[in-house]
């Protein structure tokens, strides 16, 4: 498999995602959105698409730093705010997170990172209720498939326009949309603690895992065929385990079916398919 197999017609992607955002938001009876703007590439792309879809006045970005957040992240988030002319508010989560861990001083980095992510989502949904806007998601396909995110934290949203785009495809779309190179070229990081890096956490690069995921998902290749492409057995086994183990993160809560029409199984509300006026 060659790297270019992951390449998309990004003009076509843009032409799909812009009306997708507008139509889905309006289906739910909303006109505006709120999203977390971290200074990373994923939220920058979603912000760019939302502004083009709904207009800058209908997009609110929340900057939600913790005390260890890098200055660069805040600068890059502000760069997108200034570029697009969208509305923005800064809501630090330091007080909430530190108060939570006052009685849990031995909590691991993982637990602290999860609480940071959920504290940010708390801010987003509170603003959603305050302003009557819908929360846009910023999790990409690579993160969703690997379970590299916090359930009911950064993975929570009402509409996610980039959930079917691999991380490497997000970089391509970002270049197409004209996102500043400072955001595209920097090392991916959730900025949960000083020096944190996505690829260091995962133990492999996004380019490597996207190639493997593409073969597993889009090409539906079996293990032996994938290994014949030069993928290391241990790498394949680890990634497959992550995909299988984290299936629950990609689902709404499982409901036991007891009636003829069950939410999430065979009950559909009219707005799920009706044409929007």
Curated annotation (Swiss-Prot):
Picking any one GO molecular function of the record gives: glutaminase activity
Q: Name one GO cellular component term.
A: cytoplasm
Which pathway does UniProt place it in?
Answer: Cofactor biosynthesis; NAD(+) biosynthesis; NAD(+) from deamido-NAD(+) (ammonia route): step 1/1
A Gene Ontology biological process term: NAD biosynthetic process
Residues annotated as binding Mg(2+):
42, 143
Matching entries from Pfam families are given as:
NAD_synthase
Enzyme Commission code: 6.3.1.5
Q: What class of enzyme is it?
A: ligase
Keyword Magnesium among UniProt keywords: yes
> Which domain of life does the UniProt lineage start with?
Bacteria
| Reaction(s) catalysed by this chain's protein | deamido-NAD(+) + NH4(+) + ATP = AMP + diphosphate + NAD(+) + H(+)
- Keywords noted in UniProt: ATP-binding, Ligase, Magnesium, Metal-binding, NAD, Nucleotide-binding
Detail which positions bind deamido-NAD(+): 118
Q: What are the binding positions for ATP in this chain? A: 36-43, 138, 167, 189
Chain coiled-coil ranges:
none
Q: Which InterPro entries match?
A: NAD/GMP_synthase (IPR022310), NAD_synthase (IPR003694), NH(3)-dep_NAD(+)_synth (IPR022926), Rossmann-like_a/b/a_fold (IPR014729)
Q: Which family does it belong to?
A: Belongs to the NAD synthetase family.
Spell out the subunit comment.
Answer: Homodimer.
Matching entries from PANTHER family are given as: GLUTAMINE-DEPENDENT NAD(+) SYNTHETASE, NH 3 /GLUTAMINE-DEPENDENT NAD + SYNTHETASE
Role description = Catalyzes the ATP-dependent amidation of deamido-NAD to form NAD. Uses ammonia as a nitrogen source.
What is the protein name for this chain? Answer: NH(3)-dependent NAD(+) synthetase
Q: Which organism is it from?
A: Chlorobaculum parvum (strain DSM 263 / NCIMB 8327)
**Name of the coding gene:** nadE
